UniProtKB/Swiss-Prot annotation:
Residues 97-172 bind DNA. The gene is nhr-48. SUPFAM superfamilies: Glucocorticoid receptor-like (DNA-binding domain). It comes from the Eukaryota. Its main location: nucleus. This is Nuclear hormone receptor family member nhr-48.
Amino acid sequence: MYNTRRSAYMNSCSTAMELPPQSLHQNWQDTEYVNTTCSSDMNSDMSMYNDDKDDPFYEDEGSGGGTSGGGKKSSRKRANTTSSSGGNEKESKRTANKVCRVCGDKAFSYNFNVITCESCKAFFRRNANKEKEIRCPFNEQCEINMVSRRFCQRCRLTKCFAVGMKKEWIMSEEARLEKKQRVEENRERRLQDAMNRALEEACMEDESENSYDEAPAPSHQMSVRQYLANDDAPHKSSDEVQPHLGHHGYNQKEDKMMNFYQDGPSDQGDYSLPSNSCASSSQLDTSVNCGATTIADNGASPSNTVTIPAAVDVERKPIPTNVLFSASMSAIQDVAAIISNAETKNLGMCAPDVVNENLMNVAQAAVQAQAIVNHTQQLAAAVVAQQVVSNMAPVMPTVNPLDPLLAPAFIAPPMPTPINVPITTPIAGALSTPLPPPIVPPGHSSINPVIPIIPKEMPVSVSLLNQLEQTPAEMVTVPKDMLMKLIQKNSRSTCTCSCMCGRYPPGSCIVDEVTKDLLNGGSSNSSNATDRDETRLETTEDMQMNGLLPGDCNSSIQWLNQQSSAQAFVDPITHSMTAEEAQTQRERRDSIFGSFSAADQGTVTQPKSVQEETIWEHTVAENESRELSDEEIEKMEELTEISNQWISMRLDSMPILDLFSKKNVEKIVNGLKLLSSFRFLPQVDKRSVVKRGLFNYCVVKWMQHKESMSIDGLSDAARRDFMNIIRREEFNYRVQPGAFNTLAISVLFHSISDNLISTDVYMEHLVFKKLLDKNLPIKVSSDTVYNNYYPYIIKAAKHLEKATKGLSDELVAHAVS
């Protein structure tokens, strides 16, 4: 069919040209592409991947040996396949923000249960399960770092096991091969799915391109030419039909392709005009020309203008609107199809001026047909509106109101003047649907009826009473008589009486509380009233409403003072309950919120400080979220590792003064290097932290291990200060996991505001102070513990600094370096 339409179009051209058969299926650009690429396709090793860019291991360069079909020189060389070159986008996006626990190099994540670098991960996987014994070339005490890790395999492997790496987590050879096989299968499956999707998309594109040509014309639509031809068929004979474009024979019986489109030329049409004539060359006249459409397909059929014969009486035989509408829509679709399909590429070797002329003819015909449809619809709408107004006029009665003030509201609108202008364009198609007969009001036939009586709206209370009286049930959530009295005596003003007897919370509105009781369980006299009283004291809001807890508007101390002064008048608990019930409520409240009741306290003393006054609010604000973030979890793991190293080096069993020898100071500093917060500080800040905070750090470590670490060699005053530390209440918090480890690092980084080491050190101090808050028990603030404990720690550290005469700069520099 496509070839037939193509040949019909070529026959209509003034200069027909012979085209090869393959040109009917592809344009000259496609032919050129096939000719230029066939050689490269034939010489390709893999026809599916014949593009050099598809090979991830090779890339093109400007210089090379062979030449391609396009004349470009190219060569193939091995490309970089490391992750830094973008081979693995996931690895390149990762950031090595962790530190290897074995050598100190940068690491990505956990490997075999420990944060390690890629080098130590591979080393442990290769050597952990080896049966061959590895010997240390030195003294088996090698310090493993980024440089020395490749010198001693034994010490490196020993440290891997020491930090917690597990060889049980290494995959066996069978498991590794199985995992590799699964990866290969998944890769092949994804490749096959991608190829299937590509084939489906290609098929869908081909179907969408051919859908316009293969779509049959709707049976209920008719073109203008077909309508006129069918109407004029009895007046013409088949001999009078003129051949199309005289010098080319056109057999209408054999070839019906021109009737494929709904606005195509019919079998009995008039084609007397030249093929290059334009429908817009003559002025648009609705009494002569009803429409003109053209054929628009992939072959770009020529434009034709259809003229209605003079014998056709338009007023006697009007053209229906659906015919005009289908013709205009078809023409518009033809224009869109030609533009979207790039008709200039599908015309083969045709001249460009012929193509442009055809496009202009199609566009002008579409505009003309649309104008005819719009004009017809406007005239039809005007006639319909006139008839509707004339039919509705008798329905509106003329009213003579008794009150002159109401006259403007009831005056009937004036009768519209009928349209006497004759309509030249037929509107029979628009008025094909019969209009409904005019509505005649029943009964009153007089012209001036009385004013209609508008019934007054019944009050809501009356309607509710009528509904309740008709209800067969005796109970409607509440007794019917009670509800009826409430409705009858309903007042627009809201009752504001408050409860003073203790039945409801002090100051609460009785109406609101009774409404809540009715909604919850029916009558307030029901048997479950006691249960509701007990459940009202389960939440914080209920406690605050009943005066058992401080509200948002006052502090804890102010609330206690108010409760102590109000005890002489009414007790919200004991007034409405027995002694046993009141004690039960107090125990329930105290188990949830703590003992803060004024009834349990004899006298309320004034606070000692502002900090103790706001301890409740501060504690709730600080302990809202006790979840540890990922960064905080890593810091806690580092603190645990430092503590384990302190014990492994036997520093927990020696006198406290021996910790400040040169060898032990180096051990302590090496342990602190496991902490990323200390390791990433500048060298100058590290020395300042060690010189000023190491004594504070050792005091807290002595508090952790006071049973095994002695304080021999200190003066009596120093002993008393050390004993005062462990006698304080805060000393009991050392049983909390990680609490004193965090406190030790926090006092290590602490510096007074007048003499800050640096901003980085102070920020690290705040980080560990916040971490201390999450390690302490709930309702305990880190500010309270730190501010109450830190002066005693400083005082004990001064004794140590005085007894050891401080740390020399040479010792600190050697330990830190």
